[in-house]
Curated annotation (Swiss-Prot):
Name by which UniProt lists this protein: Heme A synthase
GO BP field: heme A biosynthetic process
Enzyme Commission number(s): 1.17.99.9
Organism, as annotated: Anaplasma marginale (strain Florida)
CC annotations in GO: plasma membrane
Signal peptide residues on this chain, from the entry's feature table: none
């Protein structure tokens, strides 16, 4: 039995908006627009600058940032407006997503279209959404102090919260849409499939570290790095003493290594599980791998990089869908009516 149609559509819209938010966030980062707004004003920040005086005030605030001093000291007002608007759209869309998600919850709860367990789950998502907004500002603040870019660790944390939010929303949507656990498989195969999906999440976080360090702008060949599969600089004692995840070479190598590992581990899944979901997941993994290589050799072309980022979420969605269709031996079938009373 499916959940109320309106609930299913609403969750589908929220999932779609989250993916669009990922695209906007990627474009914001790739165009170096994220540090153009130097204040966090959740309410009054909805209104953009109006008039030349207001724009000049915003540009003056931007002039106090490390990014302006190191990278954009000669930026014109028109160019500043362009990057400001990109970040403004990013923040405004985040507010819109929060409103679209939060406002219908009381109505669905009062009209009994969702049960108490679902209400609790959705309120947890709303709380995570608030944390995500705060994490976004925490990330931006790291680029307003000394260095002209945000902390790659905070960027990874920001992305991980998005992954968590999207996964919960997508799983809820699938269950409300009536997706059932209909294919029985062994515990070993189920947990192998789950581990590959977990590796996908790890790879997405590593991708955020690569992006935060601008590591994609180096070693723009594949499969070799500096003429070798394993670059010699990885064996430097200085690297290990200075911090492995601070090093551009190390982080990019890890991202490459996990990508290959995911492809190798995902390849046998369709033959083990014998489901269309496993084939879809493998296809997404393969396409995402090719997008990653294309992004690298193009020296991070904006379109390819944005598609690579959002397709990571598409691959994750395919993985979650694959797992939702599986039932371990000895377990009971999980029905698809988790959203109704």
């Amino acid at each position: 039995m499916k959940a109320h149609f309106g609930v299913t559509v609403w969750l589908g819209v929220c999932c779609s908006m989250t993916l669009l938010m990922v695209v906007i966030g990627g474009i914001t980062r790739l165009t170096h627009s994220g540090l153009s707004i130097t204040e966090w004003q959740p309410i009054v920040g909805v209104v953009p600058p109006i008039g030349d005086e207001a724009w000049l005030r915003e540009k003056e605030k931007y002039a106090q940032t490390p990014e302006y001093r190191h990278r954009a000291a000669d930026i014109s007002l028109d160019d500043f407006k362009r990057i400001y608007i990109i970040e403004y759209i990013h923040r405004l869309f985040g507010r819109a997503l929060g409103a679209v998600f939060c406002l219908p919850i009381p109505y669905f709860a009062i009209t009994k279209r969702i049960n108490r367990a679902m209400v609790a789950k959705l309120l947890m998502v709303a709380l995570l959404g608030g944390m995500q907004g705060a994490m976004g500002w925490f990330m931006v603040k790291s680029g307003l102090v000394d260095t002209p870019r945000v902390s790659h660790y905070r960027l990874a944390g920001h992305l991980f919260l998005t992954i968590l939010l999207f996964s919960i929303l997508w799983h809820s949507f699938l269950r409300c849409a009536g997706v059932r656990s209909t294919t029985t498989t062994t515990n070993a195969r189920f947990f192998t499939a789950a581990a590959v999906v977990g590796l996908t999440v790890l790879q997405m976080v590593l991708g955020a570290l690569v992006a935060g360090l601008d590591a994609g702008l180096t070693y723009n060949t594949f499969p070799l790095m500096d003429g070798a599969i394993i670059p010699q600089s990885l064996f430097s004692a200085k690297l290990w003493h200075g911090g492995f995840l601070h090093d551009v070479t190390a982080v990019q190598f890890l991202h490459r290594l996990v990508a290959v590992l995911i492809v190798v581990c995902a390849a046998p899944l369709p033959f083990w599980l014998k489901t269309r979901g496993a084939w879809l997941f493998l296809a997404c993994v393969a396409l995402q791998f090719l997008l990653g290589v294309a992004t690298l050799v193009s020296v991070v072309h904006i379109f390819l990089a944005a598609m690579h980022q959002v397709f990571g979420f598409v691959t994750l969605a395919a993985g979650v869908h694959m797992l939702c269709r599986l039932r371990r031996e000895g377990s009971t079938c999980i029905s698809g009516h988790a959203g109704i009373s």
